[in-house]
Amino acid sequence: ELKGQDVGGEAGGDRAEPTRFKGPAVETISFEADLDATDQLEFPDQHAATVAHGLAPQIALLESLSQPSSAQLSKVNSQASSGQLEIAPMLAPLLLLVWGASRVIPVELTSVSVTGEACDPVLNPIHAKASFGLRVLTVDDLGFASKGGALFMTYLQNREQLAAKAQPVSLSTLGVTGV
């Protein structure tokens, strides 16, 4: 979903400037993924970790992307206990959604939901569905000089190049005349 950031389009906005942008659009991406350990379980000698834990390590990794690490939390607690004040929030890693070589997108994970659908005899998940909500991070979030900002600009330029390949349609083709 793309939501334009125009100057006059929102309540309280400048109605005299409805066609001016104030920054990149707010873009959100949602998708689902099927996680399945069946193929790995077919060759147990080659996939001992999957036999021992199923999909639990992959699920734990996905879930860990949405919160600070225990080490970060312990450090903040230790600093607070010693009277130090941390003003800046804890840094999250720069997440990239890679949909091919021309679509490398810096994103923030806004939601992740994993539903286990099948387990092995010791209740390790072996089939699950994961739903993701992402917000594309732009130069407004990351700045132009950062690696993430440069990746966003490349993503935007690649999209513009793709859009330029679309065949234009005249208004008369759509039945509009006299404009």
How would you label these PLM feature ranges?
Residues 1-179:
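Acidic, Ser/Thr- and Gly-enriched intrinsically disordered low-complexity segments
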